[in-house]
């Protein structure tokens, strides 16, 4: 496979620098000089907040006390992650809570598949992080109405959260159908990049999984090239290959419609060596 000209795969988890650990943003594209003459880091987000209608159930879950224990930082203000440095501690009150297998899902959307997975594996703890408040509210509402004890929800930037967590902390990190950022000038916003994967991988336990899926073919091959070239991760389907959708990842309505229209879906599972 020839290397994409925009990809530098010469990064690995062990080479994560102090600068990468301490960045105030999830990526940067250089410095800008402000009117005061000082240099400021330009923020490059991997996500874009959407303004959509919030239904009554989602609004209820964001405000009613019976849902509050699902919402880790709902009272902190928009996306404030201050003090969130141990996801296992969020389940400390549960039997074996801090010792149970831990999954982090990045960008769970409206939360349907996230909640379905949590309900199917009650002995595994699930943390979801999202910036879309209607999705956060809906997810919390579903968790509450199903009385799930193994779910926690965080509002904020996943990369910033991962920087705050200990090394070797998470058993499985999931990233399903991330924004493909199709335009070339936006490729720097793609979540799967060597620099961001260094941050992701340091948080994974030895033997932990990074699992991603996309319905954009170009992004699928971009991801397999980045991840196959990343020291410390092993493609479970073999270099250059994709895996079949595992049984534990539910098929969404959107995915079914796409497949019915002839669109492909590509899954990738990588093990931390």
From Swiss-Prot:
The UniProt annotation puts the region (Disordered) at: 1-36
Which InterPro entries does this entry report, sorted A to Z? SAM-dependent_MTases_sf, tRNA_(Gua-N-7)_MeTrfase_Trmb, tRNA_methyltr_TrmB_bact
The reply on keyword tRNA processing is yes
**For this protein, what reaction is catalysed?**
guanosine(46) in tRNA + S-adenosyl-L-methionine = N(7)-methylguanosine(46) in tRNA + S-adenosyl-L-homocysteine
Give binding positions for S-adenosyl-L-methionine.
105, 130, 157, 179
PROSITE patterns assigned: SAM_MT_TRMB
Key words of the record: Methyltransferase, S-adenosyl-L-methionine, Transferase, tRNA processing
The active site consists of 179
GO MF, one example: tRNA (guanine(46)-N7)-methyltransferase activity
Q: Which domain of life is it from?
A: Bacteria
This protein's pathway reads: tRNA modification; N(7)-methylguanine-tRNA biosynthesis
The EC number(s) attached to this protein equal 2.1.1.33
Enzyme class label: transferase
Q: Where is the composition biased (Polar residues)?
A: 1-31
Residue ranges of coiled coil:
none
Q: Which residues bind substrate?
A: 183, 215, 252-255
One Pfam short name? Methyltransf_4
GO cellular component terms attached to this protein's record? tRNA methyltransferase complex
Query: What family does this chain come from, according to its entry?
Result: Belongs to the class I-like SAM-binding methyltransferase superfamily. TrmB family.
**UniProt function note:** Catalyzes the formation of N(7)-methylguanine at position 46 (m7G46) in tRNA.
The entry's protein name is tRNA (guanine-N(7)-)-methyltransferase
Q: Corresponding gene? A: trmB
């Amino acid at each position: 496979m020839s290397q994409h000209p925009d990809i530098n795969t010469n990064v690995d988890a062990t080479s994560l620098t102090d600068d990468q650990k301490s960045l105030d943003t999830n990526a940067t594209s250089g410095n800008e000089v402000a009117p005061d003459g000082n240099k400021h880091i330009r923020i490059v987000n991997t996500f874009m907040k959407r303004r959509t209608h919030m239904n009554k159930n989602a609004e209820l879950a964001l405000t009613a006390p019976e849902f509050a224990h699902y919402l880790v930082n709902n009272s902190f203000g928009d996306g404030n992650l201050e003090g969130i440095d141990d996801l296992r501690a969020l389940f400390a009150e549960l039997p074996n809570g801090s010792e149970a297998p831990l999954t982090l899902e990045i960008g769970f959307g409206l939360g349907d598949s996230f909640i379905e997975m949590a309900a199917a594996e009650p002995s595994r703890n699930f943390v979801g992080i999202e910036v879309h408040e209607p999705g956060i509210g809906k997810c919390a509402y579903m968790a509450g109405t199903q009385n799930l004890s193994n779910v926690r929800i965080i509002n904020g930037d996943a990369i910033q959260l991962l920087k705050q967590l200990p090394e070797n902390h998470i058993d499985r990190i999931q990233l399903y159908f991330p924004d493909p950022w199709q335009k070339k000038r936006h490729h720097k916003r793609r979540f799967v990049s060597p620099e961001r994967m260094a941050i992701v991988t340091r948080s994974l336990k030895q033997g932990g999984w990074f699992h991603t899926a996309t319905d954009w073919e170009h992004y699928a091959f971009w991801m397999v090239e980045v991840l196959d070239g990343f020291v410390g991760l092993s493609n479970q389907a073999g270099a250059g290959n994709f895996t079949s959708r595992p049984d534990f990842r539910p098929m969404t309505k959107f995915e079914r419609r796409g497949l019915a229209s002839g669109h492909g879906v590509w899954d990738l599972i990588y093990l931390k060596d």
